Amino acid sequence: MKRYYGFAGVGLALDLPDGEDFSEGRELPVFACEPRAGMTDVTVRIADRLIMPEGKIRAALPNMTEYDCGDAIVRCFGALSDGADNSGIIAEYRESGIRITMKRSVYRKITASAVLETIGTERLVGMAGGAILHSSFIEVGGKAVLF
């Protein structure tokens, strides 16, 4: 199942697994859009277990560890993100797009907020020449105006 969203100059094409429960929340539907050129491809999957990345640690925080795996930057997110066994989400950032794997025992359903937080939306907006200092929106005719 593909879903498309656009905001602040960034377009996201979410490829979600068929048959999995997905929640857009109440905010995301107003950012829905038609597919267009230049969208960032984001593949989201749920797995029973996550595979530990093989690479050099670039950064380590209490809730995220980042690895340089050569052709990808891989981030493990979770309360104890010191490895795949303790992580709830692993995100692989490649030139071709972003692949997010969520651990089934942690996430019963895929939530839009978890996906958007994982992909680093503010970084994508910055790469598109924008900035997010504080975000809020109003709904106008079923669509959102972000400010």
Regions found by a protein language model. Give the residues of each.
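A noncatalytic interaction/capping subdomain that flanks phosphate/NTP-handling catalytic cores
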Residues: 1-144
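Hydrophobic anchor at the beta1->P-loop junction of P-loop NTPases
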Residues: 147
